[in-house]
Amino acid sequence: GGTSLVESMHCNARVIGFDIDPIATFITRFELSASQFENHYPEIDQVCEEVARQIMPLHRTKVDGDEYDVLHHFWVQVKKCDYCHSEVELHPHFQLAYSKEKKLQWVFCKYCHAVHELPINRKILECSCGKRTTIQAGTYNNGIMTCPNCKRTQKIAADNLDSAETPIWKLFAQEYLVGVGRNCTRHFKRTEQDDLERYLYAKRKLECLNEVNLVPNRLIPREGRSDGRPMIHGIRRYSDFFNDRQKLHLNLLGLAIQKVENNEARRCLELAFSEHLTANCMYTAYAFGYRRTSPLFSIHSYRHITRPVELN
């Protein structure tokens, strides 16, 4: 934002700007004054270290007795079939990621969620649990759910804003890191009981912070909208965009930023805090071929994600 103001200032003009959007105003004001800031503020490192000490243990996983950092947590929306009442995981396919360069893909069993590395042209997964999974035959496509039990189809969006059910999410897989620096490698695994317990621990810690909740719980405005998203998918409040571990992270980070006395350092942190919300919510997707997150508003709309990824 503020391109005309910033470029005019580069030409030594005295600039004055107005905007009705407080976020745009904050960003542009920061851009205009950034040249006067220092290159480094120790307060920023202190905030990162303080929050990391509290949140990083909740982003660890155990593999063969050893602990590793989790890079991405994979979630999937679960919806009940209107006809047979079975619970259906809304997977667009059963592929977590792929690499054209390595000619590999990482897929998971739709029954037990075990993750396998296969050649990229493989169409069927023969899992060690004894079940077969057709990799591209997902249960969700273009807003329509197909029940694997009764084969009936239904829309996942509600017909009106008031009848939409709040999404139910299930943690089913993780991408974790082995090694450090140039020797660091990325691996996939299904979630185990220890991973679920870490999430529940985060939920309990969040409950202890209820009196200082910084995540906005106000209703998303309905007036003046061109479509019903995200309310037709059960997202009615801004807090509904985040799971409990993300809310804990946001609260701890927000509280730490509030304590920073240096105004310039705090402004830098506030801007980074605002920007990182789009990649730390349950509307964050995963770019399968690039193995990285695709933030909220990457296509300039409330695109509903049935298989979001939670970033460390």
Predicted regions located by residue number:
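Conserved SAM-dependent methyltransferase scaffold
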Residues: S4-L5
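Long, structured ligand/cofactor-binding scaffold of large enzymes
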Residues: G1
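Nucleic-acid modification enzymes, centered on SAM-dependent nucleic-acid methyltransferases
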Residues: M9-N312
